[in-house]
């Protein structure tokens, strides 16, 4: 849990001068398991992702005055090589009735790094096809 929780802040602090100069943006990757019980996640993973969501908000407050925005994305079921066995059983419960794609996740990260989201700070965007509505 320590790595997932503290690596992002250590990295951002290490790049603070560069982030300030660029009026940069940090995007942390949490998980839908950080806000709701997930059948495959487990306590350690879920707790670490919830901690990262809280850290994102704190970082947004700390880094915002420096012109650095900090947000997070919380992917749900995304079609990657690390899908848990049994994920197919969850698909009917997702309102869009499909898995997300890595490209869909990447596009949200991209938007969070551009001026399109210049007033978005401290947000956690859930990318889950409506799984938690």
Spans of features found by a protein language model:
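A short helix-coil junction within the Rossmann-fold of NAD(P)-dependent oxidoreductases
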Residues: 14-25, 36
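Catalytic Tyr-x(3-8)-Lys segment
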Residues: 85-104
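Active-site helix of classical SDR
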Residues: 12, 48, 56
């Amino acid at each position: 849990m320590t790595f997932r929780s503290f690596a992002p802040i250590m990295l951002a602090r290490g790049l603070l001068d560069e982030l300030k100069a660029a009026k940069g943006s940090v995007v942390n990757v949490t998980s839908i398991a950080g806000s709701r019980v997930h059948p495959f996640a487990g306590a350690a993973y879920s707790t670490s992702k919830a901690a990262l969501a809280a850290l994102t908000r704190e970082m947004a407050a700390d880094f915002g005055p420096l012109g650095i925005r900090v947000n997070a994305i919380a992917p749900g079921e995304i079609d990657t090589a690390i899908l848990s066995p049994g994920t197919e059983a969850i698909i009917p419960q997702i309102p869009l009735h499909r898995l997300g794609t890595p490209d869909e996740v990447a596009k949200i990260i991209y938007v969070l790094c551009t001026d399109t989201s210049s007033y978005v700070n401290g947000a956690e965007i859930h990318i889950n096809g409506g799984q938690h509505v």
